[in-house]
Amino acid sequence: MKTVIVPAPGKIEIRQVETPVINAYQALVKTEMVALCNATDSKLVAGKFPGVDTYPLALGHENAGIVVAVGEKVRNFKMGDRVIGGLISDFGAQGINSGWGGFSEYVVVNDFEVLKEEGLATPEQGCWDSFEIQNAVPSHVQPEEAVISCTWREVLGAFKDFNLTPGKKVIVVGSGPVGLSFVKLGKLFGLGQNKDAGIVLKYRTQFLRTY
């Protein structure tokens, strides 16, 4: 399969690599759509992501695709499901480090609920957040909609972390994709006031008015 590689800071190439082999708790996903993360991906390409200084690495973590194979212990994914958040955390002996590896033709999702039940996924293992966000989406959700939810799930997580409940007021600083998502989700959550204090571009002001 093909994957997007950063061989060294400031460089990007497409490289042929081995297709992942899933274990009993995983599903194999054929990628349909990916999105570029302005923070993580751009910093990995620039060589400025904190704690990552070993290259080459496989790029990407925002994607959507269709399940094409499932492990024997998987219960929460089935053939044909559209899922988000697939990764490749280990490229084995291919000499490639993982920058999450989501910009690959095939990626892997883990059945997080089964892993928890069997004591194989804990916060201490460092896989908790990565596996928890790997989910199937409803069948009517299109690939371009599903991949955007990769950003929305992070915003939703922030709402939960800060205990944002209906009636509370929020000021959003910044009007990029994440800032716009905060405003939109704030309205859906019934927050009392959702203002963006960092709007610079007029088209984003107009876009916000549609919310």
What name fits each language-model region?
Residues 90-169:
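NAD(P)H dinucleotide-binding glycine-rich loop of Rossmann-like/cofactor-binding domains
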Residues 20-35, 48-92, 99-103, 108, ...:
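Glycine-rich beta-strand-centered segment in the early N-terminal region that forms part
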Residues 1-59, 122-129:
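Short N-terminal strand-loop motif that marks the start
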Residues 8, 32, 70, 175, ...:
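Cofactor-binding loop segments of dinucleotide-utilizing enzymes, especially the Rossmann-like FAD-
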Residues 10-11, 49, 88-90, 152-153, ...:
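Short beta->alpha connector loops
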Residues 139-211:
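Mid-domain Rossmann-like dinucleotide-binding core that forms the NAD(H)/NADP(H) cofactor-binding site
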